[in-house]
C-alpha cells in the first residue's frame, strides 16, 4: 500500500484525483504501477487500475494476470472492477471505500 500511496502522489502533481495502483506477482515483486492520468492524457478511461493493468500486460506479454495482486488506494469503480476481473487478477486490496470519499 505504501507503494500505491507514493504513486498516487504523482497523480495529484498532474492535477488528477490522487489514486495509485500497484500490481505485484506471487513473489511480491512489483510488476507495474499506475496512477490516474485522465487530466494528463485527456482520457476518461485512464484510471490508476487501467493504467497499471496496461503496463503489466505489456511487461509480461500476456493479458492474463492470474496469481497477481492489485493494490489500489481507493475502491475500484465499476469500469476498473470489470477490467480487474477480465484480466484475471486474483487478489484486490484497496485502502478506502469509494462511497466514503467525496471526489
PLM segments and residue spans:
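Local cysteine-cluster metal-coordination motifs and their immediate loop/turn environment
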Residues: 73-87
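A short, polar/charged loop-to-alpha-helix boundary motif
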Residues: 40-51
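Short, basic/aromatic recognition patches
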Residues: 1-14
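Short secondary-structure boundary segments
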Residues: 96-97
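Conserved small/polar residues in nucleotide/adenosyl-binding loops
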Residues: 101-103
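Immediate flanking context of iron-sulfur cluster ligation sites
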Residues: 62-74
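Short beta-strand scaffold segments in enzyme catalytic cores
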Residues: 19-24
Amino acid at each position: 500500500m505504501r507503494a500505491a500511496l507514493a504513486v498516487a502522489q504523482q497523480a495529484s502533481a498532474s492535477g488528477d484525483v490522487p489514486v495509485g495502483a500497484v500490481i505485484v506477482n506471487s513473489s511480491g515483486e512489483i510488476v507495474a504501477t499506475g496512477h490516474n492520468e485522465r487530466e494528463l492524457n485527456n482520457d476518461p478511461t485512464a484510471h490508476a487500475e487501467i493504467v497499471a493493468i496496461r503496463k503489466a500486460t505489456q511487461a509480461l506479454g500476456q493479458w492474463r494476470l492470474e496469481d497477481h495482486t492489485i493494490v489500489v488506494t481507493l475502491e475500484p469503480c465499476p469500469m476498473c472492477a470489470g477490467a480487474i476481473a477480465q484480466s484475471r487478477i486474483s487478489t484486490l486490496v484497496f485502502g478506502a471505500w469509494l462511497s466514503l470519499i467525496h471526489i
